[in-house]
Amino acid sequence: MSELGLFINPKDGGKPIELTKDNYPLTFITKITTHPRYPNRDQRNKSVNVPGLSRYNVVIIPSALCHFLAYGSVQMVRVGSYWTSGDTFHCYYDEFGGPDGWLPGSDGESHFFLYGTLKDNPPDTYGLFLNAGASAAIDNFRSITQENEVAYCVYRKKIYIDVNNNRGYWSLPNDIPNRSSALVFLRPESTSQVLRYDRPNNRIISWGAGWVYVVVFSYGLNLQPADGLTIWNKQGKVVFNSDYIPFFNNGHTIKMSGNVATSSFEKPMFSMDMPNTWLENERVNVNCYLSGFRVENNKLIANRMWTIDFYPSYANYMYNQVVYSSSYCIDFNDYF
């Protein structure tokens, strides 16, 4: 344990955490949804202005980066890269996309959740500042102040998903604020269980029954004064308390290659948001399967689930039985 920091023992009774100059909370900035058709169908580079974005060191958590459509032949539309510059978020599509013709499991929309840490705090900022020692200069972006919109761990449990009684579905609890923008991280106990997060319906879908570790982060909680640390803004609203563990910076993004992605954590939890439709060429048709992931140690492995439809065409071999996806990872040992 460090001698410098804030020790949080949350009210959910789960594993505590220590916030330090190296482990510090991330502020929710915004959620961005993009589509290859809009606002300009002839531009692959899409940009969204986010006022004040340049004030942050930004962490981008992606969802649903790849979609398939068909106009006679099957086409892939994928976000190949994404980044921020100043007050602007950018993403670049590998191909152009049409207004319709999307194969089952695709709608063309990709989602990006932007979190960050302030580069500098305003002169009148107050709160908790984490730095290297009492004599060190304040490291401004490692802080919890009245300027932050901190996301919190609002749910962390080991749950059982039953395919017999609940058809393999598990919905997020209704009392989670901003459910459609919540970050959901999963780790199944069995290496054979296949999971995906169905964001439009705020639920986990499982191929096979089993125990799953779930951690959910969200923002917009109606915070009340806590017995530990409480920070109010100038309007008298509580903007931080130590009843909950905040979403903090100990995470990283991985990208699928050959249907496998590997985390640097020994025992990671993964976001499994909306992987693309799994396509399989079968005679004159391409079968469309729902896709998901299973977990082996620190590896995330793409798998097909069940058939959702077919299309009378043939998919390019590059699209056949392949998931193009990215995942954000957190360390299981930070939460359980």
Tell where the protein language model's regions lie, with residue ranges.
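Short secondary-structure transition "cap/hinge" sites
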Residues: 141-149, 183-187, 194
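Hydrophobic alpha-helical segments, especially N-terminal targeting/anchoring helices
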Residues: 232, 294-295
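Extracellular receptor-binding modules and their adjoining Ser/Thr/Gly/Asp/Asn-rich linkers
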Residues: 1-56, 65, 80-173, 199, ...
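Low-complexity "stalk/linker" and mucin-like segments enriched in Ser/Thr/Pro/Ala/Gly
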Residues: 67-84, 190-199
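N-terminal accessory interaction module
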Residues: 48, 285-294
